[in-house]
A protein has these predicted regions:
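Long hydrophobic alpha-helical segments that form multi-pass transmembrane helix bundles
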Residues: 129-169
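Intrinsically disordered, low-complexity non-transmembrane regions of multi-pass membrane transporters
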Residues: 95, 105, 117-120, 145-162, ...
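Cytoplasmic-side transmembrane-helix entry/capping segments in multi-pass membrane proteins
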Residues: 30-42, 62-67, 88-99, 122-125, ...
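Structural signature of multi-pass alpha-helical membrane transport proteins
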Residues: 1-34, 41-54, 75, 159, ...
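Transmembrane alpha-helix boundary signature
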Residues: 26-28, 47-61, 77-92, 261-266
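Membrane-interface helix termini and inter-helical loops of multi-pass transporters
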Residues: 52-60, 143-159, 204-211, 236-237, ...
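Membrane-embedded alpha-helical segments of transport systems
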Residues: 71-72, 100-106, 122-144, 255, ...
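Alpha-helical membrane segments and immediately flanking helix-loop junctions
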Residues: 86-127, 269-303
């Protein structure tokens, strides 16, 4: 029976691997190297439509990207305040658990900040990720108007020669290696995106499309890895978290939709691309969705990368500052009492 689920090649493996780990009471192990190979392929597919005109359009939209980032992160901060008020989890953990950054990035940051509950942060980010990964593809595929860009359906008609395929494969792999060397976030995907886009612009050549079965296989490999990283046995440890976090996720999604509509009206890009650009998902999940629905991957990557870099480079200092001020205020109130 066909369930007509959004992103079946990604979400199916996530669900079955996570549930399988729950049934067998221990997590599955999935090769990081296999996941990285899949991400290189997906990153190449996202970078190949890039052109010089696309780059100029993205640069002109940078103020909008930064504004969208600040609004989305602020909405996540408001969700953290609600979580703190309605649960027994400390404010530091709520802040790190509710901000729409990547699961791994927020967990690493939580491990570096005193008083952060690593388990609580992991569970909150996992629940947020699961909500976003299921809801956003559904909205984009079944609710929003179709995107105007060519999607993966064209892939079979744009196969390149063996020499072209080998050349661009080498470009994508070298991009991933270089990105890892200089410690870029999500290097196996971001590296090929940037290297492929740069090569296309510099050489003024058309990159061969990736056949649909290859993209589907890559989605399965990435989905299986995400599913193996989810530990559903820990969800019962924090009673009352789910409802507040779900409400917070819906709030951030509404904010993202409003931002997407505004950006679509201001820039003329299609609504699917604008929504995926502002949605609080990870670069991997939103990138796969963009490929499936035929959205403008280059614009989506630019917006998502702006937020990702802000969260990784700037937000840690903001989070530490907020936590410091909160502790100072709490200490002052305790002293008065």
């Amino acid at each position: 029976m066909d369930l007509n689920a959004p992103l079946p090649w990604t979400l199916g493996p996530i669900v079955f691997v996570a549930l399988g780990s729950l049934v067998r009471k221990r997590p599955f192990r999935w090769s990081l190297r296999v996941r990285n190979i899949a991400l290189i392929l997906l990153g190449y597919a996202m970078g190949r439509p890039f052109t010089l005109e696309t780059g100029r359009a993205i640069l002109s939209q940078f103020p909008l990207m930064l504004t969208a980032t600040l609004i989305t992160v602020s909405a996540g901060g408001f969700t953290a305040w609600l979580m703190f008020r309605h649960t027994k989890i400390n404010f530091t953990s709520c802040l790190l658990g509710c901000v729409p950054g990547g699961l791994s990035q927020m967990v690493i940051l939580a491990d570096e900040i005193r008083d952060a509950d690593l388990t609580a942060v992991t569970i909150m980010q996992t629940l947020r990720m699961l909500s976003v990964v299921f809801v956003i593809p559904f909205l984009t595929i079944h609710i929003l108007p179709p995107a105007s860009h060519a999607g993966t359906a064209e892939a079979v008609h744009q196969a390149g020669s063996p020499a072209e395929v080998l050349t661009f494969a080498a470009v994508a792999v070298l991009g991933a290696i270089t990105a890892k060397k200089i410690h870029l976030p999500t290097a196996p995907m971001l590296g090929p995106i940037l290297s492929t886009a740069a090569f296309v612009v510099i050489t003024d050549s058309a990159a061969p499309a990736v056949p649909v079965p290859y993209i589907n296989a890559a989605q399965i490999l990435v989905g299986a890895y995400i599913g193996s990283s989810i530990d559903l046995t820990r969800l019962h440890q924090y009673h009352g978290m789910g409802k507040v976090l779900l409400g917070g996720v819906l709030l951030v999604l509404c904010v993202s939709m409003i931002l997407g509509i505004a950006i679509a009206n201001l820039t003329g890009i299609d609504l699917a691309t604008a929504f995926l650009s502002t949605a609080p998902g990870g670069l991997t999940e939103m990138g796969i969705t963009a490929l499936v629905v035929g959205a403008d991957s280059s614009t989506m990557v630019a917006y998502q990368l702006t937020r990702l870099l802000f969260i990784m480079l700037v937000f840690p200092y903001i989070a530490r500052g907020i936590v410091y001020l909160y502790r100072k205020k709490s200490a002052g109130q305790t002293f008065k009492d």
